[in-house]
UniProtKB/Swiss-Prot annotation:
Residues 66-126 form a coiled coil. This is rRNA-processing protein EFG1. Residues 206-221 have a biased composition (Polar residues). The lineage of its organism: Eukaryota, Fungi, Dikarya, Ascomycota, Pezizomycotina. The gene is EFG1. It comes from Chaetomium globosum (strain ATCC 6205 / CBS 148.51 / DSM 1962 / NBRC 6347 / NRRL 1970) (Soil fungus). Pfam families: Efg1 (PF10153).
Amino acid sequence: MGNKRPHQDTESSGHGFENAARKRLRTNRPHKPKPAAVDLDSLSAIKKRARAIERLLTRDNLKIPANKQGDLERELAAHKRRIEDARMKKDRSHMIHKYHMVRFFERKKAMRFAKQLEKKVAQATDPEEVAQLKADLHVAQVDIDYAIYFPFMEPYISLYAAAAAGEKEEINKAVLYLRTPRPPMWTVVEKTREDGQAALERLQNRRPQTDSSLEATQQPVQDDVAGKQHSAKKGRKGAQQPGAKTSKPEPNQKKGQARKPKDKEEESDDGGFFEED
């Protein structure tokens, strides 16, 4: 007859099997990740909230109090401003990276020219030569600020690209670079320098002009030119046909039909003006 195991041994072994089974169950269970906290300040969350408000406000059967609707409209405007600021920040970073090298090299070149001209001004004795050197020194100093404070959000226009293409002699390099035509922004930087550092920084960080503002500035010029052309045509027609009579529409004709020949004549005149030789 075999010996029986003590009660303590059987109990301890049973607990061991139970713990192992629990471990297997724990490891086999699928892991449920905790839901990530929603960042309400993130750009994606702001865009999602703005789209939700727009969809709500564009409903035909919208029935919410007027004060609640006003709050939603103000919230939507604030979200759109934040989205636009984020887009402008991204575009600004892209433009800075794109034109970083050319701005850096032109700034270094302008600083080198300014240093050379300062030495020449200190050594020169002829008044005419001193005046010319000072003028060149002023151009070099403006070139430095141009390379630094050119608006970040606008395509950079190089100062020395045309001069470098026509460079022949090393001796006249500074003269060749400093006496070439400058882009329009150079004059803006030159005038802004008089208002101080803060004005230059505002110019550097200004936002690009929109197409509507450009059209508004160009529209008066186009209207003036069109008015002059119309008056000139009218004067030529009056001089060529002083006694011409105006044709009246027949009774059976409509008002629009009587004006057709005149419209065709004006269209032919305008087309002839824009034709190339």
